[in-house]
Amino acid sequence: MWGETFDDFENDEGEMAMAKQNLIAEPARADFTFAKLPLGIQPVDFMKTHFAETAGKSMQFRKGTTTLAFVYEPATPADKGGIIVAVDSRASSGEYISSKSVMKILDIGDRMVATMAGGAADCQFWTRIVAKYCTLYELREKTSITVSAASKYFANTLYGYRGQGLSVGSMVAGYDKKGPQIFKVDSEGDRCQLKVCSVGSGSLNAYGILDNHYKPKMTDDEARKLGLRAIMHATYRDSGSGGVCNLCHITPTEKIRLPPMDVSKLWYEFADELGRDITYNPVE
Amino acid sequence: MNAHDEVQRTLNPTCTGTSVIALQYKTGVVVLTDRVVSYGKMARYKNVSRQYKVNDNVLIAFGGDHADFHWLQNVIERQVLLWKRFDQDIGPKALHGYLTSLLYAKRCKMNPVWNTLVVAGVEEEEKNNKETSTPFIGVITQKGCAYQVKHIATGLGAFLLNQAVEDEWRKKGEDLSREEAEAVLRKSLELTLYHDCVADNEFEIGRVDATEGVVLGKEEKIIGDWSIAETNCQYE
Amino acid sequence: MTSFTGITAVANATNEMAMFKQAMKEVAAHPEWMSSRQIERQRWNPYSMEGGSTCAISGENFAIVASDTRMTQNDINILTRDAEKIQILNDNIILTTSGFYGDVLQLKKVLQSRLHKYRFDYRSDMSVDLCAELLSRNLYYRRFFPYYTGAILAGIDEHGKGAVFSYDPIGCIERLGYSASGAAEPMIIPFLDCQIGHVTLSEGYERPELTLDRAISLMKDSFRGAAEREISTGDKIHLVIAEAGKPVVVKFLPLRED
């Protein structure tokens, strides 16, 4: 512990072999030892008592979101196709907006992202665990992990904490050897593959726009507009969502993060496009 | 169930002490406690000291559960002996830190030590140089919330006396003499006596001085001026 | 045993399983071995709120952190007027925490010891980015028994730029230009949004540059404003100024004491 003698160096080879062995083996399920409440206290009840509305405004966990993702095919050869992931950027603690600039698209790998809905801290923490697993997988297997496998690992990990009050609603989206894929994963341990998907408090509003305008084949411009449009409308109807719209376009070759767009400005943009005056006109 | 219920349903302490008042003066600290341990509103045990001499530099006074404090005395004694093994005398700062961790750890097990502790002492900055020693008062609540102060009143005194003691302190600040500090404490006890039904008129003033070390106080009595009762009663 | 037909057997089995699960749930919530003393103990509130507010602003080459020094009991009774909520962890990392003071102290201790170990292991000071992630993790490790704190970590990052990281009680992390936490957060943030974020300024208007002097005056203003309207904020402003390449400066400024 305190220093090395020369004898210790002779063990190096043995240690190297051991390290290699460890590297080849499948890493164990993330086994964190979280500080626990004394036996018999249910974390869910405990949180409800101390961190719900009765707690001070700043003591509530950050949450609230609209996130969406969809897969589309290119309409013309000039387009790239792939996946559009669009999210808002609001985090609220109760009625207080504790942040208006959260990045809710978290990187998992070069070609994969996870979105964040539900408890912000839960998503951030567990996404990193998944990212670590994926990186290790890539190093070990010398091939990048599939979206399916990554999301499965994510879901399994969350399942291990089921009923303990985690709150995660995430979409793992990415391009792998099987093509563009989106998996929705949540803290109940649920996991399912979808083409068009939206999660969060504003998801229903987003679905309304998305289902209306979605086509399996779109140009890149159309697809990006659709993502923006759905998020914009969701933020206007859902008070838990707002801020800017972050958009990520995963194409077969690259991952493009578009600059954030203020949803207030988007509103005027779409109003212009529809040829409609933004003032309410009951006669029309 | 709402948040207020659980405060009421808490496992209540049984035999309790009330206020502790402590004040720092030029070369040390004076600590005043009354000498009663109550069982609810009943004055269950009289002539009980609520101050504990740890060593020549440290004195601890407590408010809250008497049994828990007895347990703490054992723990503290062990800690002192542990330091002795390394030929060290535990100082007030170190003990304050240790007790903070202890109380916080117990809180995390949802099994709190039901005490408000006042660690009074003289911190030796240099070994065997009394000139550089500084007075120290540290407070720890049962949840492990700890802070250092120049003057303190705990228990009901926190509501009654904190400002009164602070005003006295601000008049002289660091230059307060021991006699003046003790006078402030006596006056403060008189005030608790009028308004705190579990406070007693028998009390003791312990002190920790840079030169004299810990001097535990003798039992004293105060009657107070009850003529103010005439102006403060609605029950005739 | 009533029937040997498959369907009833399955129905019975699922029913039994459901009942078993229910029983397990109940017994987990109220184990029989638990004495009334233990049940009482669980209802005890391990948290208290000592009030106060903290705030941090970062600029091009500086970060300033401020908090008030009041500590209250039940938001009403002032326990002390000089409780420190800011910890200078090293030359370029400053932690400031509001909330339950026991947790504030614990968090400080955890980070201090981790930083100490880092110095021992790597023979250099930790950078603020690393420490920010470390803090986030440590907050999350208490996910099921959280720290009752709103933490802000500020400092000078590896590129000499000011950095402010804001957290929720369980470690949701975000790097921001400015942040506040504690009782007066909903008062300070709109003020800073207006003055630093310029969210209320139309386009085309001149936006004053955020210099150190301006940041300090804004900080003073926000605390003086909060002390006017928030009960658990007051007494003194504890101001810590970190500028790239300069030692950390600590100041105490008076504030309303009522």
UniProtKB/Swiss-Prot annotation, chain A:
The keyword Hydrolase applies. It is found in: Cytoplasm; Nucleus. The active site is at residue 65. One of its GO terms (molecular function) is threonine-type endopeptidase activity. SUPFAM superfamilies: N-terminal nucleophile aminohydrolases (Ntn hydrolases). InterPro entries: Ntn_hydrolases_N, Pept_T1A_subB, Proteasome_sua/b, Proteasome_suB-type. It comes from the Eukaryota. Its EC number is 3.4.25.1. Disruption phenotype: No visible phenotype. Constitutive skn-1-dependent expression of the proteasomal subunit rpt-3. Double knockout with ddi-1, sel-1, sel-9, png-1 or skn-1a results in failed expression of the proteasomal subunit rpt-3. It catalyses: Cleavage of peptide bonds with very broad specificity. Keywords: Cytoplasm, Hydrolase, Nucleus, Protease, Proteasome, Threonine protease, Zymogen. GO terms for cellular component: cytosol; nucleus; proteasome core complex, beta-subunit complex. Residues 1-64 form a propeptide. Its main location: cytoplasm. One of its GO terms (biological process) is proteasome-mediated ubiquitin-dependent protein catabolic process. The 26S proteasome consists of a 20S proteasome core and two 19S regulatory subunits. The 20S proteasome core is composed of 28 subunits that are arranged in four stacked rings, resulting in a barrel-shaped structure. The two end rings are each formed by seven alpha subunits, and the two central rings are each formed by seven beta subunits. The catalytic chamber with the active sites is on the inside of the barrel. Belongs to the peptidase T1B family. PANTHER family: METALLOPROTEASE TLDD, PROTEASOME SUBUNIT BETA. Component of the 20S core proteasome complex involved in the proteolytic degradation of most intracellular proteins. This complex plays numerous essential roles within the cell by associating with different regulatory particles. Associated with two 19S regulatory particles, forms the 26S proteasome and thus participates in the ATP-dependent degradation of ubiquitinated proteins. This is Proteasome subunit pbs-5. It comes from Caenorhabditis elegans.
From Swiss-Prot, chain C:
One of its GO terms (cellular component) is cytosol. Gene3D superfamilies: Glutamine Phosphoribosylpyrophosphate, subunit 1, domain 1. Keywords: Cytoplasm, Nucleus, Proteasome. It is found in: Cytoplasm; Nucleus. InterPro entries: Ntn_hydrolases_N, Proteasome_bsu_CS, Proteasome_sua/b, Proteasome_suB-type. Non-catalytic component of the proteasome, a multicatalytic proteinase complex which is characterized by its ability to cleave peptides with Arg, Phe, Tyr, Leu, and Glu adjacent to the leaving group at neutral or slightly basic pH. The proteasome has an ATP-dependent proteolytic activity. The 26S proteasome consists of a 20S proteasome core and two 19S regulatory subunits. The 20S proteasome core is composed of 28 subunits that are arranged in four stacked rings, resulting in a barrel-shaped structure. The two end rings are each formed by seven alpha subunits, and the two central rings are each formed by seven beta subunits. The catalytic chamber with the active sites is on the inside of the barrel. Belongs to the peptidase T1B family. This is Proteasome subunit beta type-1. It comes from Caenorhabditis elegans.
